[in-house]
A protein has these predicted regions:
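Structural alpha/beta surface segment adjacent to cysteine/selenocysteine redox centers
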Residues: 17-126
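C-terminal cap of thioredoxin/glutaredoxin-like
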Residues: 2-34, 112-113, 117, 121-212
């Protein structure tokens, strides 16, 4: 079965919005998805900020231009989420999503079904502000809720998992990846869910006219 590589990050609302359409694309076109984490370094291009509980700015290292981009991004994502009955609540800080990403690598070893269940759980709860992706106990619970075995996860997180996560990120950047969601089809990079119709058209055309 043909494999499409998908880079994702749980702290990206755009990756959340792309998840289900990517599932549908794979099911329709008969391809396998190889989900890989790409942990975004948001402060490097959007600055950083932390909000109080009432939404006021507690600390900020953002320019006015960066604030406009961030505010528009959340408005745009909520607009799309509302059309699909999803909840996207703006975060109060920039989260380190690498722990949840290493959780993805852990459950991936236990099958596609538990990987989907884990991602569904983490994305939905995180964007409702119901899940702390920086808490290892919370991620262990998410692993169990997905039907995966969490025994040994902490050792994996501290050693092999962290090394694998960092190596995947470095390899992704060497291949040109800079954001999520990113899909790689036969070595060709597509960034953003707006390219899913093009990928679908390409895959279905190739499926209808297989190479001799």
């Amino acid at each position: 079965m043909r494999t499409i590589t998908v880079y994702t990050d749980y702290k990206s609302p755009y990756a959340y919005l792309a998840k289900d359409p990517i599932y549908a694309l794979a099911d329709e076109c008969g391809v396998r998805l190889d989900w890989l984490p790409y942990t975004l370094d948001i402060p490097s291009y959007l600055g950083s900020a932390e909000l109080n509980a009432d939404g006021s700015v507690a600390r900020s290292q953002r320019t006015a231009h960066q604030w406009r981009r961030v505010r528009y991004a959340y408005m745009d994502c909520r607009r799309q989420a509302n059309k699909r009955g999803l909840t996207i609540r703006g975060t109060r800080k920039i989260w380190d999503s690498s722990l949840a990403a290493i959780g993805l690598l852990w459950v991936k070893r236990q099958g596609d079904a538990v990987l989907r269940a884990y991602s569904d759980h983490v994305f939905e709860r995180f964007w409702k502000r119901e899940l702390d992706i920086e808490d290892v106990a919370v991620i262990e619970t998410a692993i169990g809720a997905a039907g995966a075995d969490a025994a040994g996860f902490r050792d994996y997180l501290a050693g092999e998992g962290r090394e694998e996560h960092d190596a995947i990120r470095a390899a992704a950047e060497s291949a040109g990846v800079f954001g999520v969601p990113s899909l790689v089809v036969d070595g060709e990079l597509y960034w953003g869910r707006e390219h899913l119709p093009d990928i679908r058209e390409r895959l279905l055309a190739e499926k209808a006219s297989p190479a001799p």
